[in-house]
Amino acid sequence: MLPKFTIIVATTALMGLGTVASAESCLEVTLTGTQGGPPVFQGQAGSGTLVTYGTQENKCRDVLLQFDTGRGTTQQLSKIGVPAGKVTAVFFTHIHSDHSEGLADLMQLRWHFNSGGPKVDVVCHQDAKSGAGHTMSCEKFAAHIGDALIHSGEMAQRLAENPKRLPGGPADLLNVSTFGPSQAPAVVWEKGDVTVSAISSRHVAGHASYRVDTPAGSVVIGGDAGNDAAAPPRDTSTSSQVELLAKDADILVHSVIHPVMGPLGTTGFPPPIYYRQSTATDLGSLAARAGVDNLMYTHLIPPLGAPRQGPYPLPAPLTADDYVGSAREGGFEGNVVVGADLAKLRLTAE
């Protein structure tokens, strides 16, 4: 695929690939949190990706889209100068706590200081019933994000000191929009030049993956998607739906598990959980087949430098080279970003 965009890569170490001339529009992708799963390691934030689009003069921040809100999302946004009141919309790949628990904090802060609005669009899959009989509900999650503070009395106290705040708490600031299951990309949100499409993908009931298209480029947020087959035998661990969504995308952001965590290793990591993730090697293959230019690994299992993934010990801590090597083994020759918190890519329209 011929290069259409100039890429700036930055990480917490402020690594760069050069400078570019000012362009009319730009798209920026920032990994707000890269912790894989519920464990914590060295202060990494929970899973989340900020996608912003706009003019270079406005730092690509005319539209700000947050995909998943793991723990610490609000603090991470503050580090890059994004106030809670500036987020345009929030999208959930699925309602697991490591991807969603930061919404209450984000919206409580917004309720304190921006209770007059505007409301925040929350976009997610409609209620989905699992094979085990339980229902995953983004709508109920959003409706009840302030319940603990309501029942503790804090909401009443805050309203007494400022009756202009919305009486229902932070949930009153949410405009929830859901979509149904789809095996083909379907538009779920639009604003100006920005279009967001979604497709159903396998992980837990109601899991979805997203694609953002703008004049400055495109990015796919795979979430925790894995293959429709729950375990081998299968050709790959990756999602055919994500591969369809990622065709010719400029950037693919995807959660990743390293093969060292597999059942042939010594970590003792549960095979059913391993098999529902996409491996670093297979994601490299998917990115190559789809014609993706940039592959951003996030939600790393295990984290870089970690001696263990939760209670599961590793034979040795992994480095970025271990993840990049797996992508190359899968046949991907493009740019690989092994996610650290606040790593970013910027696309600028030529």
Where are these regions (language model features)?
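Cap/insert and terminal regions of metallo-dependent hydrolase folds
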Residues: 205, 216-218, 226-340
